[in-house]
A protein has these predicted regions:
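Conserved MFS/SLC helix-loop-helix module at the cytosolic interface between two early adjacent transmembrane helices
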Residues: 60-99
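Small-residue-rich segments within alpha-helical transmembrane domains of MFS-like 12-TM solute carriers
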Residues: 23, 27, 109-117, 146
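Pair of pore-lining "gating" transmembrane helices in MFS-fold secondary transporters
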Residues: 5-34, 38, 106-107
Length: 149
């Protein structure tokens, strides 16, 4: 079934919005980290470990997402892997022990990586792998990241 021009535009716009919001959300950790260091007396090593676990989770999403898609539909995999994001962000505010923070930030990294995979895949699919739209997608991430600054 052929996708209409309006549907293509809708998918593209939603992907741009998602990346814009993703850029803003990742900035949250840059804002939260100094407060965590001060209030929880975290060492710079522990704080850097949190950022490392975010990056490791992001990398692991490339392995986890295809496995989930193989076990269930792609839409269900998106729902299952997106659920930890708001839960972990909320739990981050409760002052839990550092090892729990590592697990939560790892799950946030997996979810963030999954968002990247899905958005890139959707843009490639509806635009016929147009580099122009992929570049604009990543531009919206940067705008979302720097706009709150």
């Amino acid at each position: 079934m052929e996708i209409t021009k309006e549907d293509k535009r809708s998918v593209i716009d939603h992907c741009y919005l998602t990346y814009f919001i993703s850029g803003m959300v990742i900035l949250i950790f840059g804002v939260i980290l100094p407060n965590l260091i001060e209030e929880r007396n975290l060492s710079f090593t522990a704080a850097g470990g949190l950022l490392s676990f975010l990056a490791i989770g992001n990398l692991c999403s490339s392995l986890v997402y295809p496995v989930f898609c193989g076990m269930m539909s792609q839409k269900m995999a998106v729902v299952v892997l997106a659920i930890p994001y708001p839960m972990c962000l909320f739990l981050f505010t409760l002052g839990l022990p550092v090892p729990v923070l590592y697990v939560m930030i790892f799950l946030i990294g997996i979810t963030k990586g999954m968002i990247t995979i899905i958005n890139n895949h959707a843009i490639r699919q509806v635009t016929g792998s147009s580099n122009q739209y992929l570049n604009l997608l990543h531009m919206w991430y940067a705008v979302g990241f720097f706009l709150p600054c």
